[in-house]
Amino acid sequence: TLPSGVFYNHTTSIIGNGVALNIPVLMKEVKSITDRNVPMPKILVSDRAQMVMPYHILFDQYEEERLGGKSFGSTKSGIAPFYSDKYAKIGFQVSELFDEDLLKEKVVRVCEQKNVILEHLYHKPAINPDELLETLHEYREMIAPFVCDVSAYLDEAIKAGKNILLEGQLGTLKDPDHGIYPMVTSSSTLAAYGAIGAGI
């Protein structure tokens, strides 16, 4: 999750809107470097980044189990369910953590949808909306110090003539449009997508 720039004290490391943000993993990675005496990096997280939810990881595992030998070799990190929710418009953006009324309503609504699938397709335990809301409150506390409007920040950086390095992962053959479909990832891996994923 962490950009490679975290090891340089003159950089600002940005988690853009295009990232599938697993907040506990991000915090664990930050702790892993600061525990080794690396200075705390300056990190900004886009308020438009969407979060990998605990149930995304479960759904990923359940689907792999269901498919058995016909699975697509998922990393079981929740990526496919994450993007499914993002494009179905039931994902959670970081900004939504800071609107309590919206958050409560959405948690209940999304749990209703997910629990139908859990019961009838996977035959697994239901998600408790109260427990999920509490988890999101914990996420909010973790991420709050880093959240900002990254697009506005980068716009000012461009005007000031700052250097911006975009960082991605994987390669062309993992791109969902130009890769070896269906053995691909769930978001574009091409350089052209970098500006979109960063908010430039």
Named regions from a protein language model:
Residues 1-200:
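Non-transmembrane, aqueous-exposed alpha-helical and coiled segments at domain scale
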